[in-house]
């Protein structure tokens, strides 16, 4: 069987969401345990990544997660994209869509209780609001484009 490539791309802390937003330690720990395995270049691959076809599924999932939102490269996003990503992340956490149930089955430490969810959602929305204010972005600009 072929193994997946578990090499993480290099991480530049000057581009990473947590340090650039000066995220408080309690929130940093929460975000790292609930989000970073799929949404950063700091993935810690579990043992079952070596078992196929689970490894292939996992690698696909991580690649997709990084494409959608990569906290390790957050500073490279244009301000409007940052605001949109933060808004979407807050919505998905609030609605229980993130972290994924399939991830939580094997990663109990990533499960957020209601208080943690509310704290994380508030933080993400606050960072979104600050980004919008600092860059003159309107609520209208956050809305998806009509086709």
Indicate where each model-derived feature is located.
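Membrane-interface motif at the C-terminal end of an N-terminal transmembrane signal
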Residues: 1-9
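Acidic helix-start/capping segments at beta-turn-to-alpha-helix junctions
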Residues: 45-60, 140
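Juxtamembrane/interfacial segments around transmembrane helices
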Residues: 35-47, 79, 142
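Flexible coil segments in periplasmic/lumen-exposed cytochrome c-class electron-transfer proteins
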Residues: 69-73, 99-147
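Electrostatic cytochrome c docking/interface patches
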Residues: 9-31
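The canonical Cys-X-X-Cys-His
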Residues: 31-43, 98, 120
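Extracytoplasmic electron-transfer domains, predominantly the class I c-type cytochrome c fold
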Residues: 56-106
């Amino acid at each position: 069987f072929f193994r997946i490539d578990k090499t993480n791309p290099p991480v530049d802390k000057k581009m990473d969401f947590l340090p650039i937003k000066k995220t408080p330690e309690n929130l940093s720990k929460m975000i790292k345990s609930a989000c970073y395995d799929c949404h950063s270049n700091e993935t810690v691959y579990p043992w079952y990544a070596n078992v196929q076809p689970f490894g292939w599924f996992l690698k696909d999932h991580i690649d997709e997660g990084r494409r959608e939102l990569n906290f390790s490269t957050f500073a490279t996003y244009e301000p409007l994209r940052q605001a949109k990503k933060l808004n979407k992340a807050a919505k998905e956490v609030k609605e229980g869509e993130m972290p994924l149930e399939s991830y939580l089955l094997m990663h109990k430490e990533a499960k957020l209780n209601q208080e943690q969810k509310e704290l994380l959602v508030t933080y993400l929305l606050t960072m979104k609001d600050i980004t919008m204010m600092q860059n003159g972005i309107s609520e209208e600009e956050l809305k998806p484009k009509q086709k």
